[in-house]
């Protein structure tokens, strides 16, 4: 079994509330396309959380449209995503971070599955 340096990331971004709904959808699609094409990642899950109020004012807005994307990649091209966020004025906040907890949970599940398969194959081979 070859070890792949694939890591799990979570990227959350907030779109300004004055952006029309159709443009917000297009922006989410553009982010997904950047993750798949430029970052060379594989998207696991997209959560559209909708409009939420802020605890404090951000760029003169009191609310924004939240989206969270979970994806896998080797991490080498993440700067492409950060650059896109930085130059897109409709995105007023963003944060991307590695999810060590999800990676750990996944590795544990893989080890348990491998152990169960090894147990099954050793039991199946000893029958007369």
UniProtKB/Swiss-Prot annotation:
<dbReference type="GO" id="GO:0003735">
    <property type="term" value="F:structural constituent of ribosome"/>
</dbReference>
<keyword id="KW-0699">rRNA-binding</keyword>
<dbReference type="GO" id="GO:1990904">
    <property type="term" value="C:ribonucleoprotein complex"/>
</dbReference>
<dbReference type="InterPro" id="IPR035980">
    <property type="entry name" value="Ribosomal_bS6_sf"/>
</dbReference>
<dbReference type="GO" id="GO:0005737">
    <property type="term" value="C:cytoplasm"/>
</dbReference>
<keyword id="KW-0689">Ribosomal protein</keyword>
<dbReference type="GO" id="GO:0005840">
    <property type="term" value="C:ribosome"/>
</dbReference>
<keyword id="KW-0687">Ribonucleoprotein</keyword>
<protein>
    <recommendedName>
        <fullName>Small ribosomal subunit protein bS6</fullName>
    </recommendedName>
</protein>
<dbReference type="InterPro" id="IPR020814">
    <property type="entry name" value="Ribosomal_S6_plastid/chlpt"/>
</dbReference>
<dbReference type="InterPro" id="IPR014717">
    <property type="entry name" value="Transl_elong_EF1B/ribsomal_bS6"/>
</dbReference>
<comment type="function">
    <text>Binds together with bS18 to 16S ribosomal RNA.</text>
</comment>
<comment type="similarity">
    <text>Belongs to the bacterial ribosomal protein bS6 family.</text>
</comment>
<dbReference type="GO" id="GO:0006412">
    <property type="term" value="P:translation"/>
</dbReference>
<dbReference type="Pfam" id="PF01250">
    <property type="entry name" value="Ribosomal_S6"/>
</dbReference>
<dbReference type="InterPro" id="IPR000529">
    <property type="entry name" value="Ribosomal_bS6"/>
</dbReference>
<keyword id="KW-0694">RNA-binding</keyword>
<dbReference type="GO" id="GO:0070181">
    <property type="term" value="F:small ribosomal subunit rRNA binding"/>
</dbReference>
């Amino acid at each position: 079994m070859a070890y792949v340096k694939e890591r799990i990331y979570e990227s959350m971004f907030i779109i300004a509330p004055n952006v029309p709904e159709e443009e917000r959808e297009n922006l989410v699609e553009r982010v997904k396309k950047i993750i798949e094409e430029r970052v060379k990642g594989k998207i696991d899950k997209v959560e559209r959380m909708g409009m939420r109020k802020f605890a404090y004012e951000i760029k003169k807005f009191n609310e924004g449209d939240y989206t969270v994307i979970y994806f896998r990649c080797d991490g080498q091209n993440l700067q492409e995503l950060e650059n896109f966020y930085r130059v897109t004025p409709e995105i007023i906040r963003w944060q991307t971070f590695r999810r060590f907890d999800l990676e750990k949970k996944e590795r544990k599940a893989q080890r348990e599955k491998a152990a169960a398969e090894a147990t099954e194959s050793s039991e199946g081979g000893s029958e007369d």
